Amino acid sequence: MTNTPIIPRVGIATDAHQIEAGKPCWIACLLFSGADGCEGHSDGDVVAHALVDALLSAANLGDLGSFVGVGRKEYDGVSGTQLLTECRELLESHGFTIGNGAVQLVGQSPKMGPRREEAERVMSEILGAPVSVSATTTDHLGFTGRSEGRAAVATAVVWK
């Protein structure tokens, strides 16, 4: 009998959205009252979107665009919570286990620090695996530094 080693698979992804005045601000599956959200076909949650993309990349199951597409009515305004849930279900249906995820928000606002642990808890519960969240500014450089948009970078580990 041969023991086949479990080989972790790593995915990486980014997401970016333009800030839209007056739109609710969803970041890491949390609503940030008083901050403008991001435009998009969905809720504009760059953190959740980047993590979904990283998970799909790790499992070689496409990307966010192929997963939900743009222009599909059933996904108009879809939440990051729903996308993460459906992504977890897809990975499980293909025999994958999620090891962990890590996401960094890039932008001037909202301040993630006060709600970082809450974001980690919520996303970890959705995925059934540890998720770490961090944030950084770009010292006012680029579109995120000028508060024109937000971005996120994510990695994920899965195995079969």
UniProtKB/Swiss-Prot annotation:
Involved in the biosynthesis of isopentenyl diphosphate (IPP) and dimethylallyl diphosphate (DMAPP), two major building blocks of isoprenoid compounds. Catalyzes the conversion of 4-diphosphocytidyl-2-C-methyl-D-erythritol 2-phosphate (CDP-ME2P) to 2-C-methyl-D-erythritol 2,4-cyclodiphosphate (ME-CPP) with a corresponding release of cytidine 5-monophosphate (CMP). It comes from the Bacteria. It is an enzyme of class 4 (lyase). Gene3D superfamilies: 2-C-methyl-D-erythritol 2,4-cyclodiphosphate synthase. Pathway: Isoprenoid biosynthesis; isopentenyl diphosphate biosynthesis via DXP pathway; isopentenyl diphosphate from 1-deoxy-D-xylulose 5-phosphate: step 4/6. GO terms for biological process: isopentenyl diphosphate biosynthetic process, methylerythritol 4-phosphate pathway; terpenoid biosynthetic process. Binds 1 divalent metal cation per subunit. Belongs to the IspF family. It catalyses: 4-CDP-2-C-methyl-D-erythritol 2-phosphate = 2-C-methyl-D-erythritol 2,4-cyclic diphosphate + CMP. Keywords: Isoprene biosynthesis, Lyase, Metal-binding. InterPro entries: MECDP_synthase, MECDP_synthase_CS, MECDP_synthase_sf. A divalent metal cation binds at residues 15, 17, 49. Its cofactor is a divalent metal cation. 4-CDP-2-C-methyl-D-erythritol 2-phosphate binds at residues 15-17, 41-42, 63-65, 136-139, 143, 146. One of its GO terms (molecular function) is metal ion binding. The gene is ispF. The keyword Metal-binding applies. This is 2-C-methyl-D-erythritol 2,4-cyclodiphosphate synthase. CDD domains: MECDP_synthase. The lineage of its organism: Bacteria, Bacillati, Actinomycetota, Actinomycetes, Mycobacteriales. Homotrimer. It holds the Pfam family YgbB. The record marks 41, 137 as: Transition state stabilizer.
